[in-house]
Amino acid sequence: MLTIAGVEFESRLFTGTGKFSSSQLMLESIKASQSQLVTVAMKRIDLKTGADDLLSPLRQAGVRLLPNTSGARNAKEAIFAAELAREMLGTQWVKLEIHPDPKYLMPDAVETLAAAKTLCERGFIVMPYVHADPVLCRRLEEVGCAAVMPLASPIGTNQGLVTEPFIKMIIEQAKVPVVIDAGIGAPSHAAHAMELGADAVLVNTAIASSASPIEMALCFKDAVNCGRRAFEAGLGRVQTQAVHTSPLTGFLQQ
């Protein structure tokens, strides 16, 4: 069971709501994934009514909403978006995203740390999207973040665990859950992240842009479960030299 800020999750697959062709397909895919934590971009919500066609079906599905600050270019904008989410959605949870460069969507480490500190002081449950930087993740943990979300590769690229060496370091040292976010493009990527010891993964593009999002959601669900079970079972040690599985000469001596 995964626990974040005192809340237990049976599923270690978190999902997003963007890029689906319809709200109905989004909802059916989320149900198929069995995800219990779903991200929602504040920039997609009608600021006048506090709702859109996303929120009602998601609430009916019983998932926990994780509003994100995607689109924020600095700490000030991210803090504003988080406060807006708390007021409109009634949640302290926030996925902190600050990426001023619209081309590569790389997270701004300096602004993210500053915003995280302020939001934690204001009582938010902060889950920051960041580079796979072990030092930065330690700093975010120290200011009170409930989890850290290092990227596997750039958002939406489906490149997989490009940052694997650094993710391993983060997992090794972290005292809060590590959720691998961004760039996970195949169920095998998700399984591998879980085999490394990640606490969860967040997947959006790979499911939403699939020819069959519902089927792909099922695949990711199974992959995450298998990867976690493999980690808990204990994977064999990787070696450079061959190791025989049975005696090579015993039968010759008989």
From Swiss-Prot:
Pfam family membership, one: ThiG
Binding-site list for 1-deoxy-D-xylulose 5-phosphate: G156, A182, G183, N204, T205
Active-site positions on this chain: K95 (schiff-base intermediate with dxp)
InterPro entries with a match to the protein in the record: Aldolase_TIM (IPR013785), Thiazole_synthase_ThiG (IPR033983), ThiG (IPR008867)
Function of the molecule: Catalyzes the rearrangement of 1-deoxy-D-xylulose 5-phosphate (DXP) to produce the thiazole phosphate moiety of thiamine. Sulfur is provided by the thiocarboxylate moiety of the carrier protein ThiS. In vitro, sulfur can be provided by H(2)S.
Oligomeric and partner information: Homotetramer. Forms heterodimers with either ThiH or ThiS.
CDD domains hit by this protein: ThiG
Keywords carried by this UniProt record: Cytoplasm, Schiff base, Thiamine biosynthesis, Transferase
Entry EC no(s): 2.8.1.10
Catalytic activity: [ThiS sulfur-carrier protein]-C-terminal-Gly-aminoethanethioate + 2-iminoacetate + 1-deoxy-D-xylulose 5-phosphate = [ThiS sulfur-carrier protein]-C-terminal Gly-Gly + 2-[(2R,5Z)-2-carboxy-4-methylthiazol-5(2H)-ylidene]ethyl phosphate + 2 H2O + H(+)
Keyword Cytoplasm: yes
Enzyme class, UniProt record, top EC level: transferase
Subcellular location: Cytoplasm
Pathway: Cofactor biosynthesis; thiamine diphosphate biosynthesis
One MF annotation (Gene Ontology) recorded for this entry: thiazole synthase activity
Protein's name according to its UniProt entry: Thiazole synthase
Any one of the GO BP annotations: thiamine diphosphate biosynthetic process
Gene Ontology CC terms, in alphabetical order: cytoplasm
Protein family per UniProt: Belongs to the ThiG family.
Gene for this chain: thiG
